[in-house]
């Protein structure tokens, strides 16, 4: 941890939970003498190191979408960077230029006032906010060390704002942890889902499909809302049917009326990611398909492949739950039209679609 992080509440919380984990105080993360290794090896080294650092930027911000594709209007409460899980497709491998898991030590003293002000403003204006913590980190993978999600939930229930907090994760919920939380349908526990073979081979350290769905069912029974994100959908000849089976498992396990939304997004990646991921994880085969460069500079599957996958997944979801909000992540209006049969502009725009889903399911 940085010397400047010692006096903050989150630092004290992490130290109280760290047990026998070795702790070092360093002058500066920026000037830390990282091992002299190639970037892929340094990334792997960083998966086992947690840095507590005071953050100097904005904690509450807009999702880093792109003007080239339709964005959902998501807002981010930025609590840290990096993830101890090791998914071969993770964009963070090519996004940051320094290794290690990072938590912002000054989150509660300086970050929470930013978020609280936004929540109070939304309450005054009767304006819905959809906020998440899982853009640059898994929302719950470090919860046993930091307690950030639990503290956020407890603060959330004290503020009657028209806002949902979405906690995106690939880990399972501990039953004792879930039982001690104050239930609130404005809290959305969300799981990234994939075909079983992808989860097993490409999402190292994550919970199994069954563990994620069981956690979702427990969260729904406990009074929370849930969501699912099929992102990235990875297309091999055998995987589309496997994704449809996952849809069936969702609705066999989780009550549809507690699902606020389901997103669909196909594998896309910055060109640099392929080289880094294949060097770190040589057994991966997700980059062996045919890709084209999209409008955002990322590599994507050809449009007909994406639209067919989205069309079939959406059709299966609709067979189970016609009312559940389904949306595409980072796709053009043309793909929406071909895959889902409409464009969000016809329904007031994608942000409005999601706001209405939150109003209906989360009790806003």
Give the location of each predicted region.
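Auxiliary Fe-S-binding modules of radical SAM enzymes
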Residues: 1-11, 251-364
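N-terminal alpha-helical interaction blocks
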Residues: 1-45
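N-terminal [4Fe-4S]-dependent radical SAM core
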Residues: 29-80, 94-103, 363-364
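Conserved Radical SAM active-site core
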Residues: 51-69, 91-190
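Short cysteine clusters
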Residues: 83, 87-90
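Hydrophobic faces of well-ordered beta-strands that scaffold small-molecule active sites
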Residues: 129-133, 165-167, 189-191, 226-230, ...
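Conserved radical SAM core fold
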Residues: 136-141, 172-175, 187-206, 232-236, ...
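Catalytic cores of alpha/beta
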Residues: 238-253
């Amino acid at each position: 941890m940085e010397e400047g992080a010692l006096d903050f509440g989150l630092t004290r919380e992490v130290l109280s939970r760290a047990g026998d984990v070795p702790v070092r105080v360093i002058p500066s993360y920026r000037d830390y003498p990282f091992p002299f290794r190639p970037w892929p090896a340094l990334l792997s080294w960083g998966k086992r190191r947690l840095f507590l650092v005071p953050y100097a930027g904005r904690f509450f911000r807009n999702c880093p979408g792109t003007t080239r594709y339709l964005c959902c209007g998501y807002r981010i409460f930025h609590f840290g960077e990096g993830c101890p899980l090791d998914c071969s497709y993770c964009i963070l491998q090519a996004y940051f230029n320094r290794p290690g898991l990072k938590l912002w030590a000054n989150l509660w003293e300086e970050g929470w006032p930013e978020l609280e002000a936004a929540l109070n403003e939304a309450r005054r204006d009767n304006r819905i906010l959809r906020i998440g913590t899982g853009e640059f980190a898994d929302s719950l993978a470090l919860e046993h060390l930091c307690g950030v999600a639990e503290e956020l939930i407890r603060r959330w229930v004290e503020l009657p704002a028209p806002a949902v907090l979405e906690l995106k994760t690939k880990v399972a919920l501990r039953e004792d942890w879930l039982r001690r939380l104050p239930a609130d349908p404005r809290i959305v526990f969300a799981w990234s889902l994939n075909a079983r073979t992808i989860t097993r081979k490409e999402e190292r350290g994550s919970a199994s499909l069954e563990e994620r769905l069981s956690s979702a069912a427990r969260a729904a029974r406990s009074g929370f809302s849930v969501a699912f994100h099929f992102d990235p959908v990875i297309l091999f000849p055998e995987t589309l049917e496997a994704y449809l089976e996952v849809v069936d498992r969702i609705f066999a396990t989780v009550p549809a009326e507690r699902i606020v939304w389901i997103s669909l997004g196909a594998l896309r990646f910055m060109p640099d990611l392929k080289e880094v991921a294949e060097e770190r994880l040589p057994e991966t085969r997700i980059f062996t398909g045919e890709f084209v460069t999209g409008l955002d500079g990322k590599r994507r599957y050809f449009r007909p492949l994406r639209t067919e996958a989205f069309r079939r997944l959406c059709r299966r979801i609709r067979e189970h739950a016609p009312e559940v909000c389904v949306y595409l992540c980072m796709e053009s209006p043309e793909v929406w039209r071909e895959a889902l049969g409409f464009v969000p502009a016809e329904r007031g725009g994608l942000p409005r679609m999601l706001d209405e889903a939150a109003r209906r399911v989360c009790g806003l």
